[in-house]
Amino acid sequence: SVVKREDFSLPAYVDRRDYPLPDVAHVKHLSASQKALKEKEKASWSSLSMDEKVELYRIKFKETFAEMNRGSNEWKTVVGTATFFIGFTALIIMWQKRY
């Protein structure tokens, strides 16, 4: 088949605030540079630069807590849709009263 089926019996990665440590890492297939960084991680963390620490974090997690807590713009869609339907209903009521 064309579409790959998910096996839900295996652990999956998910970013959730109430479950901060997922069962598996975000990046499943590491590149050569990422593998080298994972080997360097086993040594002292004081020898790692800040960029390397951030890269290690991004291998394990997709988003930070700040990114997870960031608000979305979905409310604009909800308000716009509700306003559209209220206006459409008002037009129908005015049309019914006139004719």
UniProtKB/Swiss-Prot annotation:
* Residues recorded with modification N6-succinyllysine: K4, K35
Q: Which residues lie on this side of the membrane: Mitochondrial matrix?
A: 1-73
Biological role:
Component of the cytochrome c oxidase, the last enzyme in the mitochondrial electron transport chain which drives oxidative phosphorylation. The respiratory chain contains 3 multisubunit complexes succinate dehydrogenase (complex II, CII), ubiquinol-cytochrome c oxidoreductase (cytochrome b-c1 complex, complex III, CIII) and cytochrome c oxidase (complex IV, CIV), that cooperate to transfer electrons derived from NADH and succinate to molecular oxygen, creating an electrochemical gradient over the inner membrane that drives transmembrane transport and the ATP synthase.
The subcellular location is: Mitochondrion inner membrane
Keyword list, A-Z: Acetylation, Membrane, Mitochondrion, Mitochondrion inner membrane, Phosphoprotein, Transmembrane, Transmembrane helix
Identify the coding gene: COX4I1
From which domain of life does this come? Eukaryota
What subunit structure does UniProt give? Component of the cytochrome c oxidase (complex IV, CIV), a multisubunit enzyme composed of 14 subunits. The complex is composed of a catalytic core of 3 subunits MT-CO1, MT-CO2 and MT-CO3, encoded in the mitochondrial DNA, and 11 supernumerary subunits COX4I, COX5A, COX5B, COX6A, COX6B, COX6C, COX7A, COX7B, COX7C, COX8 and NDUFA4, which are encoded in the nuclear genome.
Where are the N6-acetyllysine residues found in this chain?
Answer: K4, K28, K35, K42
| Membrane topology of the entry | Single-pass membrane protein
Please give the name of this protein: Cytochrome c oxidase subunit 4 isoform 1, mitochondrial
**What coarse category fits the chief subcellular location reported for this protein?**
mitochondrion
- Gene Ontology terms describing biological process: mitochondrial electron transport, cytochrome c to oxygen
